[in-house]
Amino acid sequence: MQIIRDIAMLHRAVTALKQGGKSIALVPTMGALHAGHLSLVRMAKRVADHVVVSIFVNPTQFGPNEDFAAYPRDEARDAALLVEEGTSLLWAPDVGTMYPGGHSTHVEVAELGADYCGAARPGHFDGVATVVAKLFNQVRPDIAIFGEKDWQQLAIIRRMARDLDFGIDILGAPIAREADGLALSSRNAYLSAEQRTAAAAFPGALKTAAKAIADGADVAETLARAEAAIVGGGFDSVDYVALADADSLERLAVFRAPARLLAAARIGRTRLIDNLPVG
């Protein structure tokens, strides 16, 4: 596996990988790789000839009071895992490479980024869309793979890729979960043992709510019960629990397919997100 940090070297390496009509799948990450990330890499291997993984902890998607400095980083461990998975290339730029002096352009997907995590984390999705657009231009993949755990992010990237004519197939990978249902996340490492036990209440409440809504229960009442169950299970607060159109992300007061149950909640200093299909 090549580890590259320079854009000119990246372009040469990508050109070599594409010789003979070979295809490339990109898996963008912020590192601190876990089994969920590795499931994306394996999916990429199934759909393309070569897999490029990027590791970049993107400062522009963190708010001023968020965990950029504390976000876990262990490139040597991550690289070893990617070698085991047969990754062709690791793109690991630094902040100066991604955002050189004078950088002043950003991408905004206004409609899809305004609600849910966008409301709780102003500017977050502008940072995500901008860095992903740059990664697309740098790597020039045929396919890009993102986890479905951040459903809003996936919807935003799909819209951006369509609106800006990137010509890249955007694939979503199913959420990888622990045995008790908690979605795998690098931020799970922040949880104490007690918090980790309590965190199972989050996916449990969403699973119950998704089934109830699909079975015809009142949406508003079901969402309120889910919020109460999450807080009752040990969470400090709930940012949102919402039923949304799976494509447009429009909030739904009455169930119609395709729909997704979206949620974010806080336990201690950790903010967790999750979602489930409904129906």
From Swiss-Prot:
It catalyses: (R)-pantoate + beta-alanine + ATP = (R)-pantothenate + AMP + diphosphate + H(+). It comes from Sphingopyxis alaskensis (strain DSM 13593 / LMG 18877 / RB2256) (Sphingomonas alaskensis). Keywords: ATP-binding, Cytoplasm, Ligase, Nucleotide-binding, Pantothenate biosynthesis. (R)-pantoate binds at Q61, Q153. The active site is at H37. One of its GO terms (biological process) is pantothenate biosynthetic process. Belongs to the pantothenate synthetase family. NCBIfam families: cyt_tran_rel (TIGR00125), panC (TIGR00018). ATP binds at residues 30-37, 147-150, 176, 184-187. The keyword Ligase applies. One of its GO terms (cellular component) is cytosol. Homodimer. One of its GO terms (molecular function) is pantoate-beta-alanine ligase activity. It is an enzyme of class 6 (ligase). The keyword Cytoplasm applies. InterPro entries: Cyt_trans-like (IPR004821), Pantoate_ligase (IPR003721), Pantoate_ligase_C (IPR042176), Rossmann-like_a/b/a_fold (IPR014729). This is Pantothenate synthetase. Pathway: Cofactor biosynthesis; (R)-pantothenate biosynthesis; (R)-pantothenate from (R)-pantoate and beta-alanine: step 1/1. PANTHER family: CYTIDYLATE KINASE/PANTOATE-BETA-ALANINE LIGASE, PANTOATE--BETA-ALANINE LIGASE. Catalyzes the condensation of pantoate with beta-alanine in an ATP-dependent reaction via a pantoyl-adenylate intermediate. Its EC number is 6.3.2.1. Beta-alanine binds at Q61. The reaction proceeds by a bi uni uni bi ping pong mechanism. It is found in: Cytoplasm.
